[in-house]
């Protein structure tokens, strides 16, 4: 809602809308100013992770971390803005059986850029550490992105340097440049869609590091949601001399969701991307399992009953990697804000069978939100290998834990969680806390 100024009481006569002086002592209400968003929005977060090993295989670890994100536009009424996403952490590890701990201090800047976009202008400039929100194939780079954005189309050109892939520190080893052209829906359209075509080239000491073209499409309506990207790599120079074909399709990703009726939804997808950068505050056996079997093709269906109960099943086939080729069959159930306590229940059961291993994974979560600003969850899970070619043998692991989320005054957010893991190849207790201020 629009913020209003308090009414001002005039001690003397003041002009009224009719032009006549208002009676002495009459209240004059000043005009309400339209609400304006603050020029800079963002969040500041402090986090702490502790892992305590309870066997001879797991090291102890402590990791305090700090995170800041800023997003500013039209600073001081100017066409300038800024983006900042920086994270720092200090990791202390106590090796198993060791008396000397090791410490690793890391500070990484994921975004650090100046923006230029004059009101009413179609030209947008971004200078600094960034990634392209339009081109999913482009990772971080230090340089300039120039875009012209019109009602039904846009075009962009970028150039700069790739940071060190391991540390994200500034580096001049790899130079990068590219361009794209995009057709998209007009602002008043009820359906969001886009089609993007472009090419990117990166070079090391004048030699090709990677050259590729890409096609990317998105479509979102009430019934259909689609995201698809296909990259096409070109090989020449040293890579061609090593026997690579001149042109090769690489890095395909498709995500499709079709709402057949209000109660039935179908989903399908395909992912053979080689490298995906993942961000995890907490790693559990469940996230490790899903990350390990990310690639492949999948399809499934979900049914909504009584607007609160969701039942679903899917099958995931890992087709590309012969070492993990096989299938994962999953069934799941969930509820959303069920009963006056706003119960949230999620349960999942997965059967996996591939060239390396076979077994079962089960997990469940029970959450309750007694108030809009408090949420409490408890979780439990187990994974049991029936067959494995790993040198560590069969993996049998169980885990359970709890978390609490608190929201204070719509600006402060607190999260606390604890997880205990008991497995044949590792036992540990994991505690995590976070406090975030949003403005």
Task: Enumerate the language-model features and the residues they cover.
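Gram-negative and organellar
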Residues: 3-439
């Amino acid at each position: 809602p629009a913020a209003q100024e308090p009414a001002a009481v005039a001690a003397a006569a003041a002009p009224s809308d009719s032009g006549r002086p208002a009676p002495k002592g009459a209240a004059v209400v000043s005009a309400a100013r339209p609400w304006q968003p603050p020029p800079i929005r963002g969040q500041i977060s402090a986090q702490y992770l502790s892992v305590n090993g309870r066997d001879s295989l797991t090291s102890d670890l402590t990791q305090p971390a700090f995170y800041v994100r800023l997003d500013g536009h039209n600073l001081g009424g100017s066409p300038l803005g800024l983006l900042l996403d920086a994270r720092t952490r200090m990791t202390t590890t106590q090796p198993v059986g060791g008396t000397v701990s090791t410490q690793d201090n890391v500070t990484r800047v994921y975004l650090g850029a100046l923006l230029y976009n004059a009101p009413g202008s179609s030209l947008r400039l971004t200078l600094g550490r960034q990634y392209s929100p339009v081109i999913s194939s482009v990772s971080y780079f230090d340089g300039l992105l120039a875009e012209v954005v019109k009602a039904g189309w846009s075009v962009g050109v970028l150039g700069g340097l790739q940071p060190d892939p391991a540390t994200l520190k500034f580096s001049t080893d790899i130079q990068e440049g590219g361009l794209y052209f995009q057709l998209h829906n007009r602002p008043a359209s009820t359906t969001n869609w886009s089609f993007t075509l472009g090419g990117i080239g990166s070079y090391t000491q004048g030699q090709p590091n990677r050259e590729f073209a890409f096609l990317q499409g998105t479509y979102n309506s009430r019934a259909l949601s689609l995201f698809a990207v296909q990259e096409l790599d070109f090989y020449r120079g040293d890579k061609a001399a090593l026997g690579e074909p001149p042109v090769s399709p690489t890095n395909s990703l498709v995500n499709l969701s079709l709402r057949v009726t209000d109660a039935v939804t179908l989903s399908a997808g395909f992912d053979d991307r080689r490298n995906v950068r993942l961000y995890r505050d907490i790693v559990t056996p469940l996230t490790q399992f899903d990350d390990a079997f990310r690639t492949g093709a999948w399809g499934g269906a979900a049914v909504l009953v009584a607007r609160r109960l969701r039942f679903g099943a899917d099958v995931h086939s890992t087709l590309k990697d012969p070492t993990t080729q096989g299938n994962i069959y999953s069934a799941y159930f969930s509820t959303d804000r069920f009963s006056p306590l706003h119960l949230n229940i999620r349960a999942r059961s997965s059967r996996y069978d591939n060239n390396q291993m076979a077994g079962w994974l089960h997990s469940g979560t029970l959450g309750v939100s007694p108030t809009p600003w408090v949420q409490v969850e408890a979780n439990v899970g187990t994974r049991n290998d029936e067959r494995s070619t790993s040198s560590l043998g069969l993996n049998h692991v169980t885990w359970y834990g709890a978390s609490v989320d608190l929201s204070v005054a719509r600006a402060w957010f607190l999260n606390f969680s604890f997880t205990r893991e008991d497995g044949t190849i590792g036992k540990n207790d994991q505690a995590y806390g976070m406090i975030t201020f949003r403005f």
